[in-house]
Amino acid sequence: VEWTDFERATIKDIFSKLEYDVVGPATLARCLVVYPWTQRYFAKFGNLYTATAIAENAMVSKHGITILHGLDRAVKNMDDIKNTYAELSVLHSEKLHVDPDNFKLLADCLTIVVAARFGSAFTGEVQAAFEKFMAVVVSSLGRQYH
């Protein structure tokens, strides 16, 4: 993947401004509410029966934060995201048996949460850079499935 200077700067800027303890939980909670079939991967998290229960679930919050910290690795290794996520791809495919389509759903939820946080600063150009980055992440996480 070729990154422009604008794309690199935009991705680094977005992640430097994200409040991981807010955005991570909000993203995973949104995914679990909007796409309830994704809850099957989180059965050990306990009560996921309502949007309120999901939003207040400490394990959802913790894992949402973990996901964002995982994205830090991609931000720091934009030229080699596929290899950066090789082990994570194996984990999700072979051990956790996560449907790779769910990575795209989570990426879409993150885009919505980030757009809401950034407001008018999340211009079309910024969104294009962010979605390109997330598409590479999603592809890399799904790599083991192919």
From Swiss-Prot:
GO molecular function terms attached to this record: haptoglobin binding; heme binding; metal ion binding; organic acid binding; oxygen binding; oxygen carrier activity; peroxidase activity
Tissue distribution of the protein: Red blood cells.
Claim: Iron is one of the keywords in the record: yes
Cited Pfam families: Globin (PF00042)
GO cellular component annotations of the record: blood microparticle; haptoglobin-hemoglobin complex; hemoglobin complex
Gene Ontology biological-process entries: hydrogen peroxide catabolic process
Matches recorded under CDD domains: Hb-beta-like (cd08925)
InterPro entries associated with the record: Globin, Globin-like_sf, Globin/Proto, Hemoglobin_b, Hemoglobin_oxygen_transport
Gene3D superfamilies tied to this protein: Globins
Residues given in the record as heme b binding sites: H63, H92
Family assignment from sequence similarity: Belongs to the globin family.
Record text on subunit structure and interactions: Heterotetramer of two alpha chains and two beta chains.
Additional information: This fish has five hemoglobins: Hb C, Hb O, Hb 1, Hb 2 and Hb 3. Hb 0 presents the strongest Bohr effect while Hb 1 presents the weakest Bohr effect.
Database matches in PANTHER family: HEMOGLOBIN FAMILY MEMBER, HEMOGLOBIN SUBUNIT EPSILON
Protein name: Hemoglobin subunit beta-0
Gene source species: Pagothenia borchgrevinki
Gene assigned in the entry: hbb0
